[in-house]
UniProtKB/Swiss-Prot annotation:
One of its GO terms (molecular function) is RNA binding. This is Bifunctional protein PyrR. The gene is pyrR. Homodimer and homohexamer; in equilibrium. Pfam families: Pribosyltran. It catalyses: UMP + diphosphate = 5-phospho-alpha-D-ribose 1-diphosphate + uracil. It comes from Streptococcus equi subsp. zooepidemicus (strain MGCS10565). GO terms for biological process: DNA-templated transcription termination. Regulates transcriptional attenuation of the pyrimidine nucleotide (pyr) operon by binding in a uridine-dependent manner to specific sites on pyr mRNA. This disrupts an antiterminator hairpin in the RNA and favors formation of a downstream transcription terminator, leading to a reduced expression of downstream genes. Also displays a weak uracil phosphoribosyltransferase activity which is not physiologically significant. The keyword RNA-binding applies. Belongs to the purine/pyrimidine phosphoribosyltransferase family. PyrR subfamily.
Amino acid sequence: MKSKVIVDELTMKRAITRITYEIIERNKQLDNVVLVGIKTRGVYLARRIQERLEQLESLHLAVGELDTKPFRDDMRVEEDTTSMPVDITGKDIILVDDVLYTGRTIRAAIDNLVSLGRPGRVSLAVLVDRGHRELPIRADYVGKNIPTSKTEEIVVEVVEVDGQDRISIVDPE
């Protein structure tokens, strides 16, 4: 199994900053936006975007935590650990995740989201888009496009969980 670091801490920070600037540019009513991180690493990325928005715009946005496991079609989990600090009805939701691959996690996230309320709009921010979609889902905000083969895996590490910030590509062969 070969692993290669392809994005270091500084480059990862820049990608998050770029996503933040794009969110500012594309959202006329930032005070109506709710950032919703997809557990686990998406939550930490959403918090980092929130921190950058606070620094740049002096605006504190709510950050929710979305558990997709109970809504996935490939596993059965009863407990839903979703935490949403505000009513999402009519809000502009930005789902935040670390890697966009087949689109199945995002489908599950949207299913969970609409079970909580009726958002005005839903968009998607991902740190890495690696391609290979199985569903018609695309990200509105992308930190890095990293084409991969289907056998390769993208591993995103965040300091809050893994002790460091970096992105690696792993080839099991």
